[in-house]
Structure formats: structure tokens, C-alpha cells
Amino acid sequence: MKMTAIAKASLALGILATGTITSLHQTVNASEHKAKYENVTKDIFDLRDYYSGASKELKNVTGYRYSKGGKHYLIFDKNRKFTRVQIFGKDIERFKARKNPGLDIFVVKEAENRNGTVFSYGGVTKKNQDAYYDYINAPRFQIKRDEGDGIATYGRVHYIYKEEISLKELDFKLRQYLIQNFDLYKKFPKDSKIKVIMKDGGYYTFELNKKLQTNRMSDVIDGRNIEKIEANIR
């Protein structure tokens, strides 16, 4: 009888211990799932807020170069309103002079100090060398969207007004259009991408599940040589 009682007690303790462990394991999994969900949700909100936000363009302005702490900047003064743009890659060599006139800037505000100076990344191009009365290129823009029961395809054109255009400007304007017209960031975009295809067969890709990398915001391409643009929303 004693052995039976001991066995029963051991079994009960084992069930209780196992139950506690299982419950704890489930709680940990639930917490991890919640944290992951909250992070994904925050990522979507951050992307949607950024690409739904305001942008501005400064035309035919002069950028004054300075460097500090290994970083390189151009300062623009437009009617006593200052914009500081951090530059990367080839722009560091392109704009080595202290004074760089004849520039167009695509600005998205990353921050602003107490004096009203706006901080931005890249988006610097040289102004058009020829005169144009309208757009200079109108590549086909094809949008494919997963709509549950299949893939729907839509088409339009995307007008280009610059001989030089930054990846920053292309990325921002294309995503903003998709947000406004195709519910981009209504859910997490997973493997969604935009592909800008050039006439020579080269291409540039924007991954829609993250913000364009800051160093790529300085990259510039010839707007006249864009063949077509494709977006896949999944």
C-alpha cells in the first residue's frame, strides 16, 4: 500500500510539474509571438508614416560642402531656411568643391533642430542641362498585387522630369503612389519589391519591407534611360 501511495504521489507531482512547465513554455511562446507581432506592426506603421509624409524639392540651388567626424554634408540656404544633406558614395567625390551650384535636391525630413534646419539624406542631382516643356521620359509602370484569389495586374506610366534622378526620389514617389492607390503597408509586405529596369538591361531593386538604405539615397541614375518599372505587392 505504501508503494502504491508513493507511486500515486510521484505521478501527481510529475503531472503537476509537467503542467507547470508546459504552461510556462506556452507563456514564453505567447510573449515572443506578441513581441514579434508588435515589432512587425511598428515596422509597418513606421514605413507607412515615412512614405506617406511630405517631401519637397529645391531647384537650382547651391550646396556648400563641409565634413565633420568622417561624415560629409552639403548645406543649402533657400530664403534663409537651411537644409543639411548628408551625402554618400560617389557624391563625396562629385561634390568635393566648397561651393557647388546648379543642384536640385529631393528632401524628406529626417529630423529638424531648434533653429529650423532640416536634416535629410542624399537626393542630390545636377539640374537639367537641356530645356524641357514637359516630362522627359514616361516609362511603363506595371503593378502586380496578390488579391487572395489570384494576381491582379495594373498598368500606368510614371513621368520623369529630370535627366539625373536619385534612387531616393524614385523610391519615395513610387511607394507613396502604391500607398495611396494599392494599400501598400495595410499589411506586412513580405517579399514585395519595386524593380526599375534600364534600357541597357540593368536594374535597381527597392525592397518594400524596409526603408531604402541611407547610402543608396545618394545613388543617381539617368532618368532618360529608364525602360520600365515593375512593382510586385504580396
Curated annotation (Swiss-Prot):
Q: What induces it?
A: Induced by Sae and repressed by Agr.
Source organism's superkingdom?
Bacteria
Q: Which Pfam families match?
A: SSL_OB, Stap_Strp_tox_C
Kindly list the GO CC terms recorded for this protein.
extracellular region
- What span is annotated as the signal peptide, if there is one? 1-30
**UniProt keyword terms in alphabetical order:** Signal
- What family does the Swiss-Prot or TrEMBL record give for this protein? Belongs to the staphylococcal/streptococcal toxin family.
> Self-association or partners: how does it assemble?
Interacts with host SELPLG; this interaction prevents SELPLG-mediated neutrophil rolling. Interacts with host MMP9 (via sialic acid-containing O-glycans); this interaction inhibits MMP9 activity. Interacts with host GP1BA and GP6; these interactions play an important role in platelet binding and activation.
Record's function text? Secreted protein that plays a role in the inhibition of host innate immune system. Modulates the interaction between host SELPLG and P-selectin thereby preventing initial rolling of neutrophils toward the site of infection. Interferes with leukocyte trafficking by inhibiting host metalloproteinase-9/MMP9 activity. Also associates with two different platelet surface receptors GP1A and GP6 leading to platelet activation and aggregation.
Name of the featured protein? Staphylococcal superantigen-like 5
Q: Which organism is it from?
A: Staphylococcus aureus (strain Newman)
